[in-house]
Amino acid sequence: MTEKTITRMDLSEAVFREVGLSRNESAQLVESMLQHMSDALVRGEQVKISSFGTFSVRDKSARVGRNPKTGEEVPIQPRRVLTFRPSHLMKDRVADGNKS
């Protein structure tokens, strides 16, 4: 399996090639979409992309953790975490891609 990472530039280049917008407009479109998604997540909203998946923010409560080296109990503060749940279609596509 290759270790390729898709970047913003890759996404805007794909929009440029496949949609036909200028490179500048393609980059602006990608930035705008990512900004809208980020803003919604900061507000605690879910971002659902059909046939792809759902991004959401979960609140995790405070708890007591343990230092694995010393065994000492350590308090873990409450926090918000970002989660992604892929759609069934995305799960199937990824699983089918693994069959070589």
Curated annotation (Swiss-Prot):
Q: Which SUPFAM superfamilies match?
A: IHF-like DNA-binding proteins (SSF47729)
A single Gene Ontology CC term: cytosol
Q: Name one GO biological process term.
A: DNA recombination
Q: Is Transcription tagged as a keyword?
A: yes
Q: Which GO terms describe its molecular function?
A: DNA binding; structural constituent of chromatin
Keyword presence, Hydrolase:
no
Q: Which keywords does this Swiss-Prot/TrEMBL entry list?
A: DNA recombination, DNA-binding, Transcription, Transcription regulation, Translation regulation
Task: Describe its partners and assembly state.
Answer: Heterodimer of an alpha and a beta chain.
| Protein function | This protein is one of the two subunits of integration host factor, a specific DNA-binding protein that functions in genetic recombination as well as in transcriptional and translational control.
Q: Which NCBIfam families match?
A: himA, PRK00285.1
Q: Which family does it belong to?
A: Belongs to the bacterial histone-like protein family.
Full protein name: Integration host factor subunit alpha
